[in-house]
Every structure is written in C-alpha cells, then in structure tokens.
C-alpha cells in the first residue's frame, strides 16, 4: 500500500507525527510525506521533534513547493492520502481545486483519480464557511475525521487521545493501530444479553 501524508500548519502536529510512527511499523505501507512551511514550524512548537526527525519517519519526503514530484501526477499510483492536521486554508483550497502547493496538488490528484482522501480538520469553533467546505468535500467522497476525543476508553494521557484519533484515521484504510482501544459495548448490556439467551 502507498499512502501520501500531508501535514499543514494547523495545530495538531502530534497527530501527524503519531500517524507516521504507526505507519512506520507497517512494512506493507510505503509513505510519501509532504510538510508545508508552517507544518514544520508547528512541529517544532508542539512536539519534541524537528521537521527533519519527522521527515525521517516517512519512506519518501517531498518538497512542498515541488509540483514535479511523483505524487503530483495521477499516473503515479497510490492508495490514497491523509492530510493531518488539515488547516482550513488547505481544506478550502482542496474544495476549490486550487493546488498552490504540493499538499493541495496531491490531494487534487487523489480526488480526480477517485482514490481515498482523508482530512483531519483542525479548527474550533467552525464558521459557516468551514462547514460548507467540509460538506462539499464530504459529498465528493472525502472522509472527514475531525480529531475529537472519545471518553468511553478513559484516556489518561494526551497520547491516549492522539492514538485513538490515529486509529480512527487508519480505520479508513483498513489498517489496525496497535494501541486502539475499541468500544466493547456496555457491561450491563452484555450481562443482559447473557441472562436472556
């Protein structure tokens, strides 16, 4: 499997790093990373890693200004793309087909080729413009996976929350996260079922 990972300047850099770390442990997945200029700044602000450290997690790291990169062409076959975190600027550009950098161009290619595109939008609160852009992309078949925490799994650390979001992103491609803590139903519901068998 070949996956493109785009990281933009929205807050949420730990999500992108954790995704790349998880994919690094999957020998059957080849990763192509594109970090925008502001993604690199955000990585160094929000994580203990440098942009170079993060680039080393991917099999291939592309210059965000290189419109001649392999992933800018539909003839270069991939299984899809994840933009994590996805800024509202990037999301709006993808909706409009405005590919001013490699993140936008790669997403545009994935869309036109009918491949899987997953966006992890990071903004709060959301304006009507943001919501309309997300709705339009959803109608095009784009998966919107906002990084909303779950509490049924009783997260104890920020990493627990990050791993849950990454697991839900990987679910979109049928990939299993080793730290996923999945919903098992309510204990009383299971007891009720057993008592009434």
From Swiss-Prot:
Catalysed reactions, as listed in the record: dimethylallyl phosphate + FMNH2 = prenylated FMNH2 + phosphate
Pfam family, one: Flavoprotein
UniProt keyword annotations, A-Z: Aromatic hydrocarbons catabolism, Detoxification, Flavoprotein, FMN, Prenyltransferase, Transferase
SUPFAM superfamilies given in the database record: Homo-oligomeric flavin-containing Cys decarboxylases, HFCD
Positions with a binding annotation for FMN: 9-11, 36, 87-90, 122
Enzymatic class: transferase
Annotated disulfide bonds: none
BP terms from Gene Ontology: catabolic process; response to toxic substance
One term of GO molecular function: carboxy-lyase activity
EC number(s) recorded for this UniProt protein: 2.5.1.129
Family per record: Belongs to the UbiX/PAD1 family. YclB subfamily.
Summary of subunit composition and partner proteins: Homododecamer.
PANTHER family: FLAVIN PRENYLTRANSFERASE, FLAVIN PRENYLTRANSFERASE PAD1, MITOCHONDRIAL
More details: It is not known, if phenolic acid decarboxylase forms a complex composed of EdcB, EdcC and EdcD. The term subunit is often used in reference to the operon, however there is no experimental evidence to prove the existence of the complex.
HAMAP family membership: ubiX_pad (MF_01984), ubiX_pad_yclB (MF_01986)
Annotated function: Involved in the non-oxidative decarboxylation and detoxification of phenolic derivatives under both aerobic and anaerobic conditions. Flavin prenyltransferase that catalyzes the synthesis of the prenylated FMN cofactor (prenyl-FMN) for phenolic acid decarboxylase.
Protein name, UniProt field: Probable UbiX-like flavin prenyltransferase
Originating organism: Escherichia coli O157:H7
């Amino acid at each position: 499997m070949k996956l493109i990972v785009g990281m933009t300047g929205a807050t949420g850099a730990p999500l992108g790093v954790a995704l790349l770390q998880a994919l690094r442990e999957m020998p059957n997945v080849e990763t192509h990373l594109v970090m925008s200029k502001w993604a690199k700044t955000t990585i160094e602000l929000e994580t203990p890693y440098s942009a170079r450290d993060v680039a080393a997690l991917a099999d291939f790291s592309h210059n965000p200004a290189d419109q001649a990169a392999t992933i800018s062409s539909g003839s270069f076959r991939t299984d899809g793309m994840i933009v994590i975190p996805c800024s509202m600027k990037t999301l709006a550009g993808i909706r409009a087909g405005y590919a001013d950098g490699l993140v936008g161009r790669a997403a545009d290619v994935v869309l036109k080729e009918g491949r899987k595109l997953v966006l992890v939008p990071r903004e709060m609160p959301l304006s009507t413009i943001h919501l309309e852009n997300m709705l339009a992309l959803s109608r095009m078949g784009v998966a919107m996976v906002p990084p909303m925490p779950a509490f049924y799994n009783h997260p104890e650390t920020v990493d627990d929350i990050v791993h849950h979001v990454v697991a839900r992103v990987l679910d979109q491609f049928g990939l299993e996260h080793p730290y996923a803590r999945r919903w098992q139903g309510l204990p009383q519901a299971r007891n009720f079922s057993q008592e009434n068998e």
